[in-house]
Amino acid sequence: MNYIKQTRIENVVGFCPHNGDYSYERKGRSYLVLDGVILGKEEVPCALSLRGTHMYVWYASGRFELYRGHVLVKEIGGNTNLLNEQTQYIGTHLLDLATFQTYYNYAFPIDEHPVLSDSIPYMLYVEDDVIIAYDNFRKKEIRRIDNRTEALWSFSFVDLGEDNIYTPGEVDHIVKILGIVNDLLWFSTQFGRLVALDVATGKVVYQLSGNPADQDKVEYTQVAGLGDCFFREADKSIICISYLGFQVIDATTGDLAESSVFLEEDPDGIGRFDYIYAPNLQGDYFTFLAEMKTDWYGIGRVGIFDLKARKLLWTEEIIPFEERKATRNHLVTSQPLYISGDKLYIKDVKDTLHIFQRE
């Protein structure tokens, strides 16, 4: 497998890795490119998300646009936010200026009718008919609610236990909700834990941890460091990737199905890198940013790892040392590498979108 650089597009703000649509700024003007058609905009879109046959376009001002192809179907003037990609609803919110508390709701984008009877001070995750509300820092809990916002159950993050090694006295919180599998709600936490709750009762079903602070806690199944966790729909697995290796967890049983250490499995491939950043699951592969201790002036290298073959497929220094030194341009961990069909997409710190084509 090999990729060659096809093009570079400067001043890109938002882009959709599923089909390559993007927004950009040039000479003080803003543009949105959908299906190869350039649309002039009053402000530049910050986020593009392909959901089914529609493109969701979101602006920093809170404005939202719904497109089919390059045709505008619906526009909402403000106070919107994108929800998780498992839903086609659009999030809405209002800020209480007296308390600086944000209240959330959601609606179908066509009719804008709120689903919840009242907006609530909880972030929302919606999948099918399940509504999950959570507050990491005030209420410090997760709950399932109905359309009337009544709690069907609640789970306090205090019950996850403290980390008495790295962050004593602090309460754990959600980093990512991975999804619902066989009536299990899976999420990863700030303290390096992976938790599954019964979506009907809110009771803990599985708890895994790679945190040394949990080694003596009988309620946790010990695994190697979890790193970044992703749900893989194809085989109902959770893939956890760190700089040391990866682990595959059966999301239906909570069992560790696979475990791999990069230095042992692929020492001359991915194992030769000193640092692995921004792993991004893409089916049976994951992409990453890489760095050696001898590298200078930031990150310039990316790679693709085959989870089944357990080996590095491709790597490239897409921003060479000379360019990084001369321009201070480099890659950033907040912008991972995406695979879409036969193309690769990644943005650098100067908002240039690099597009690669597979040979």
Model regions and ranges:
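Repeated scaffold domains used in trafficking and secretory/extracellular systems
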Residues: 6-19, 41-54, 75-87, 91-92, ...
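Surface-exposed loop/turn elements that mediate protein-protein interactions on large endomembrane-trafficking
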Residues: 1-8, 28-43, 61-77, 92-116, ...
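Polyanionic, low-complexity segments and short acidic motifs
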Residues: 346-347, 351
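Loop-centered beta-sheet repeat module
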Residues: 175-195
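Conserved beta-propeller blade signature
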Residues: 23, 56, 89, 131-132, ...
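Loop/turn-rich, solvent-exposed surfaces of beta-rich toroidal or solenoidal domains
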Residues: 243, 269-307
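Short, solvent-exposed loop/turn segments at conserved positions within beta-propeller repeat blades
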Residues: 135-138, 187-190, 240-241, 294-299
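Long amphipathic alpha-helical segments with strong coiled-coil/leucine-zipper propensity
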Residues: 231, 238-242
